[in-house]
C-alpha cells in the first residue's frame, strides 16, 4: 500500500516519459471493473480486504445495483519497477516510478459513446476478454474504435478460475482456449490496424497477454514465469519467454528442448506452457479444492508462499484466494504489462498528433502536440463532462496535449463548430481550478503539464459536451470524436405539473452535457424529445433526468424510432419549380446514392471539408462515379455533413455562383425535414440540370431562391419512388443449445433475420447473430428471457439502415401506416403530399 500525497503525484506528472494513460475496454460482464479494483488496491486507495467486491470504479448507485458500469471513471495509480524491468522498456524512461492514469469504461453496447470519450484521452488500452465466452461483438466494436484512434492494445484473458472450477478443463484444452482467443483478437487487430502503428498484434511470449482471475485477484504473464525460471536455472530470460508459449516441449530425461510433442521413444511430452506455468496452478487448485491437508504445505513451501497466523485455518475457496493472491498478485502482472508495453504520452503523441489535430500538420500547435511540449501554448481536449457531487455543476474532463494548464489561467474555449478567425462557438474565460480525478473524489492541484489527464472547474457553462481549450488564437480545434452508435430511439418527455417546466428545460440541458451520445431537442409540435442509442441507454438517461438533472416527476411517452427518408429510383421526369415572383426556374432530378457511398460519408471517409479533387478521386476510383460529377458536389446535407448530395450538372448558366449559397441553405432545410413525414433524408442525390435566372440581381435574392430549391427538391424526391429506411440492430445472443428454438421463435415474431449460428469451440455455448429492426426491439430482452428460461443474453448494437419494402403512400402497407401515424402525431395532413403540390408547370 502506498501512502499518497498530492505533491508526490504532481512530481510524477512532470516526468512525462513515465506516465501511462490507459483505458480498460471489453464486452459487458467480462470483468473490467473487478480487474480495475485489484489495480486500484495496489495503488493504495482502497483497502485490501474489500477489493473484488468493492467495484470502486462504479461510482454511481445504479451501477452498483445493476452490476454494470455506465459512465467511465478515472483514477491515478502509482507503480514502481525494479531496475531489471526498467531495462526491458523499449522507450525512453526516467527513474523507477511510474504514474498510470486508468480509465474504466463501460462494456455495455448502449454506452459505447462513453468508451469513445475515454479512448480519446488515452494512448493504450487493456482489452479484457472472458476465457469461456471469448471475443464477442462488443469486444470487436471497442477494439475497432481503439485502433481507429491509434491506441495500442494489450490483452487480459480474464475469468480463468471459471475454466478451472466450472468447466474442469485439462491443461492442453486450456492452452488451446487461450491460443484461440489470442488468435481471434489478432485477427481483429490486423483487420482494423493503422499501418502507422506498426505491428500491434499481441503475443503471450512477448508479454503482451496476461491471464487473470479478477474475482480471486490473481494474474500472470509469461514474462513473470520466465523471470522466476531464468533465475532458478540460470538461463536467458528472453529465450525462456519464447519457449513458454507455442509448440515447444521440454524433455525432462534428456534435459533438452524440442518442438516435437513426442520424445525419441514415442512417449508424449508435455507442452512447456502447460508444464512450467499451468502445472503449479492446477496442482494448487486440486490440492486446495479437494482438501488435501498434507499436500498443501509441501506445495506452498516449494512456491515460497508464507501464510500468516489466521490464514492457516482457512480452507476451500477462501484459502485458494489467499494463496493465489500471494503467488501471483494481479496488480503486479497487470501494472508490469502496462508499464512495459503501453506507450508514454511522449511516444504516442508523436504518431497520434495528425489524427488528433484538425489544422495543418506542420503548424506550431501540431508540432507541440507531437513533441508533448509542456512549455508550448496550451492545447487541451475536453472529451466529456462529469457531474460534481453538488447537483448542477460539471467538471470538464480531458487531457492536456501540449502546454501546461493552471488554475486561474485565461483561456479560449472552442466548441466543436469553431473555425479559426471566426467568433462563433468561442468563449474567453478563466479556469477556476484544476483538479485530479480520483474515482469517487477529486483533489485540487495548481497546474498540470502536457500528457496528463485533468479535470477543470468553472468552464462547464461554455461547453456542451466536448471541445478544445487553447491560449493562442491561431490554434485549430482538436478533431471531433466519431461515435460508432447513433441515437435512434426517442421518447417525448413532459412534466406532470406545469409549474415544473423550467426545471425540465434546465434538466434537459444538463442531461445532454453529462452524456456524450444523447440528443435532446424540441420538436415542432412543442414536445421535448430525448433520443438515445437503445432501450437501456434511454432508461438510464430518463432515470438521471428525473432524479438528478431535473428533479421533478415526469410523464414519458412510449418510445419512437427515428426513420430516414430516401428514394429508390431516378425521378420519372424532370422536376421544375418557379420562384414566388415567377422570374427564376430550377430544374432538377433526384436519384439514390449507393449504400457504400452513404456509409463512407457517415464514417468520415468522404468528408465535406476535404479537398474536392481528393474527394472526386475516391468517388471515381472506389465507387465508379463520373469524375466531372464528383468534382461538382455543391454540398452535403443535412447539417453540412449528412449522406445527401447536390450535384451541379448545368451547362453554361449565367449568375449560377451567386445563388449557390441559397441553394445550399435550401438543401440543408429540405434534407433535415423530408417531404414524406418530416424526417432526415438519407442517400438522396439531387442533380441540378438547368437554372434560368432573372438578369437583375434584386429579383434573384435568397427569398426567391431558397423556397424554390426546397420545393423542387421535394418534387424530385416524390417523383423518384420515395421510400423510408428503418434502423436495424445487430443482435448477438449467447446461449446453450436447448435455448436456440426459443430464440428463433422470438426473432421470427419480431421480423428478425438470423445471419449466423455457430458453436464456440470447447464450450456448450452457441452464438446466434441476427438483424432485428429497432422498431421491434422494445421489450425484446424480456421476451427472449421468457422464451429461453433466462438462458439467453442479447447484445443489441446499431448496425445499418434498411429500406422498408412497401408503398409509403398506401396506408395499408407497413411503411404507409408508420408514415401516417407519424404525420398525425406531428400535426400534418395524414396523406403523403402528391408531387404536384411542389411542381410548377411551365
Curated annotation (Swiss-Prot):
It is an enzyme of class 3 (hydrolase). Has antigenic properties. InterPro entries: EFG_II, EFG_III/V, EFG_V-like, EFTu-like_2, G_TR_CS, P-loop_NTPase, Ribosomal_Su5_D2-typ_SF, Ribsml_uS5_D2-typ_fold_subgr. GO terms for biological process: translational elongation. It catalyses: GTP + H2O = GDP + phosphate + H(+). SUPFAM superfamilies: EF-G C-terminal domain-like, P-loop containing nucleoside triphosphate hydrolases, Ribosomal protein S5 domain 2-like, Translation proteins. PANTHER family: EUKARYOTIC TRANSLATION ELONGATION FACTOR 2, TRANSLATION ELONGATION FACTOR-RELATED. The keyword ATP-binding does not apply. Belongs to the TRAFAC class translation factor GTPase superfamily. Classic translation factor GTPase family. EF-G/EF-2 subfamily. It comes from Candida albicans (strain SC5314 / ATCC MYA-2876). It is found in: Cytoplasm. Keywords: Cytoplasm, Elongation factor, GTP-binding, Hydrolase, Nucleotide-binding, Protein biosynthesis. One of its GO terms (molecular function) is GTPase activity. GO terms for cellular component: cell surface; cytosol; membrane; plasma membrane; ribonucleoprotein complex; yeast-form cell wall. Its EC number is 3.6.5.-. GTP binds at residues 26-33, 158-161, 213-215. Catalyzes the GTP-dependent ribosomal translocation step during translation elongation. During this step, the ribosome changes from the pre-translocational (PRE) to the post-translocational (POST) state as the newly formed A-site-bound peptidyl-tRNA and P-site-bound deacylated tRNA move to the P and E sites, respectively. Catalyzes the coordinated movement of the two tRNA molecules, the mRNA and conformational changes in the ribosome. This is Elongation factor 2. The modification Diphthamide is found at residue 699. Its main location: cytoplasm.
Amino acid at each position: 500500500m502506498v501512502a499518497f500525497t498530492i505533491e508526490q503525484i504532481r512530481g510524477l506528472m512532470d516526468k512525462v516519459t513515465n506516465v501511462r494513460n490507459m483505458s480498460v475496454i471489453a464486452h459487458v460482464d467480462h470483468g473490467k471493473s473487478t480487474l480495475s479494483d485489484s489495480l486500484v488496491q495496489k495503488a493504495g486507495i482502497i483497502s485490501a480486504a474489500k477489493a473484488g467486491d468493492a467495484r470502486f470504479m462504479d461510482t454511481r448507485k445504479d451501477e452498483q445495483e445493476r452490476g454494470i458500469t455506465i459512465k467511465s471513471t478515472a483514477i491515478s495509480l502509482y507503480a514502481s519497477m525494479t531496475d531489471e524491468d526498467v531495462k526491458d522498456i523499449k522507450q525512453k524512461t526516467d527513474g523507477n516510478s511510474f504514474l498510470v492514469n486508468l480509465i474504466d469504461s463501460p462494456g455495455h453496447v448502449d454506452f459505447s459513446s462513453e468508451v469513445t470519450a475515454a479512448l480519446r484521452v488515452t494512448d493504450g488500452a487493456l482489452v479484457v476478454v472472458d476465457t469461456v465466452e471469448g471475443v464477442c461483438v462488443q469486444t470487436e466494436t471497442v477494439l475497432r474504435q481503439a485502433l481507429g484512434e491509434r491506441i495500442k492494445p494489450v490483452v487480459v484473458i480474464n475469468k480463468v478460475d471459471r475454466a478451472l472450477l466450472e468447466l474442469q478443463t485439462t491443461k492442453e484444452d486450456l492452452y488451446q482456449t487461450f491460443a484461440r482467443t489470442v488468435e481471434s483478437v489478432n485477427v481483429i487487430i490486423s483487420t482494423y490496424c493503422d499501418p502507422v502503428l506498426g505491428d500491434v498484434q499481441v503475443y503471450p511470449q512477448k508479454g503482451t497477454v496476461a491471464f487473470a482471475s479478477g474475482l480471486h485477484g490473481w494474474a500472470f504473464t509469461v514474462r513473470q514465469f520466465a523471470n522466476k525460471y531464468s533465475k532458478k536455472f540460470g538461463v536467458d530470460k528472453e529465450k525462456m519467454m519464447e519457449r513458454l508459449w507455442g509448440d515447444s516441449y521440454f524433455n525432462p530425461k534428456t534435459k533438452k528442448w524440442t518442438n516435437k510433442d513426442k520424445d525419441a521413444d514415442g512417449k508424449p511430452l508435455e507442452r512447456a506452457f502447460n508444464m512450467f506455468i499451468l502445472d503449479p496452478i492446477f496442482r494448487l487448485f486440486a490440492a486446495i479444492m479437494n482438501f488435501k491437508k498434507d499436500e498443501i504445505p509441501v506445495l506452498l513451501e516449494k512456491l515460497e508462499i508464507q501464510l500468516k497466523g489466521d490464514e492457516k485455518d482457512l480452507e476451500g475457496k477462501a484459502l485458494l484466494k489467499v494463496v493465489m493472491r500471494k503467488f501471483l498478485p494481479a496488480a503486479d502482472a497487470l501494472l508490469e504489462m502496462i508499464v512495459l508495453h503501453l506507450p508514454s504520452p511522449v511516444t504516442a503523441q508523436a504518431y497520434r498528433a495528425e489524427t488528433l489535430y484538425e489544422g495543418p500538420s506542420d503548424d506550431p500547435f501540431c508540432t507541440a502536440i507531437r513533441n508533448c511540449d509542456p512549455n508550448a501554448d496550451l492545447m487541451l481536449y475536453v472529451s466529456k463532462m462529469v457531474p460534481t457531487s453538488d447537483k448542477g455543476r460539471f467538471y470538464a474532463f480531458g487531457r492536456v496535449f501540449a502546454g501546461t494548464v493552471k488554475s486561474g489561467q485565461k483561456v479560449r474555449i472552442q466548441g466543436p463548430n469553431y473555425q479559426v478567425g471566426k467568433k462563433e462557438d468561442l468563449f474567453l474565460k478563466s479556469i477556476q481550478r484544476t483538479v485530479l480525478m480520483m474515482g469517487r473524489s477529486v483533489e485540487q492541484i495548481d497546474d498540470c503539464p502536457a500528457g496528463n489527464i485533468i479535470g477543470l472547474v468553472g468552464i462547464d457553462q461554455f461547453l456542451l459536451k466536448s471541445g478544445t481549450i487553447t491560449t493562442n488564437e491561431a490554434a485549430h480545434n482538436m478533431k471531433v470524436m466519431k461515435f460508432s452508435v447513433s441515437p435512434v430511439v426517442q421518447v417525448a418527455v413532459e412534466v406532470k405539473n406545469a409549474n415544473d417546466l423550467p426545471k425540465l428545460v434546465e434538466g434537459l440541458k444538463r442531461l445532454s452535457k453529462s452524456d456524450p451520445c444523447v440528443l435532446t431537442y424540441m420538436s415542432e409540435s412543442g414536445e421535448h424529445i430525448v433520443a438515445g442509442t437503445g432501450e437501456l441507454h434511454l432508461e438510464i438517461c430518463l432515470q438521471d433526468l428525473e432524479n438528478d438533472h431535473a428533479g421533478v416527476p415526469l410523464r414519458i411517452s412510449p418510445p419512437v424510432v427515428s426513420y430516414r427518408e430516401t428514394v429508390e429510383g431516378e425521378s420519372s421526369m424532370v422536376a421544375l419549380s418557379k420562384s414566388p415572383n415567377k422570374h427564376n426556374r430550377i430544374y432538377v432530378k433526384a436519384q439514390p446514392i449507393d449504400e457504400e457511398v452513404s456509409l463512407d460519408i457517415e464514417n468520415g471517409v468522404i468528408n465535406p471539408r476535404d479537398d474536392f479533387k481528393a474527394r472526386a478521386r475516391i468517388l471515381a476510383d472506389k465507387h465508379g462515379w463520373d469524375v466531372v460529377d464528383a468534382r461538382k458536389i455543391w454540398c452535403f446535407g443535412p447539417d453540412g455533413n449528412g449522406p445527401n448530395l447536390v450535384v451541379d450538372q448545368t451547362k453554361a448558366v449565367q449568375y449560377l455562383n451567386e445563388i449557390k449559397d441559397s441553394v445550399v441553405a435550401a438543401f440543408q432545410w429540405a434534407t433535415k425535414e423530408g417531404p414524406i413525414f418530416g424526417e432526415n433524408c438519407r442517400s438522396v442525390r439531387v442533380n441540378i440540370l438547368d437554372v434560368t435566372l432573372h438578369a437583375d440581381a434584386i429579383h434573384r435574392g435568397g427569398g426567391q431562391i431558397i423556397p424554390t430549391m426546397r420545393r423542387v427538391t421535394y418534387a424530385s424526391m416524390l417523383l423518384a419512388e420515395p421510400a423510408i429506411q428503418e434502423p436495424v440492430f445487430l443482435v448477438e445472443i449467447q446461449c446453450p443449445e436447448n435455448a436456440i428454438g426459443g430464440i428463433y421463435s422470438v426473432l421470427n415474431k419480431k421480423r428478425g433475420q438470423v445471419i449466423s449460428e455457430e458453436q464456440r469451440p470447447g464450450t456448450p455455448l452457441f452464438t446466434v447473430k441476427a438483424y432485428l429492426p429497432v422498431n421491434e426491439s422494445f421489450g425484446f430482452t424480456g421476451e427472449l428471457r421468457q422464451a429461453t428460461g433466462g438462458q439467453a443474453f442479447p447484445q443489441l448494437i446499431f448496425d445499418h439502415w434498411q429500406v422498408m419494402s412497401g408503398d409509403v403512400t398506401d396506408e395499408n402497407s407497413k411503411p404507409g401506416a408508420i408514415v401516417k401515424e407519424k404525420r398525425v402525431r406531428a400535426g400534418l395532413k395524414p396523406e403523403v403530399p402528391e408531387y404536384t403540390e411542389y411542381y410548377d408547370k411551365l
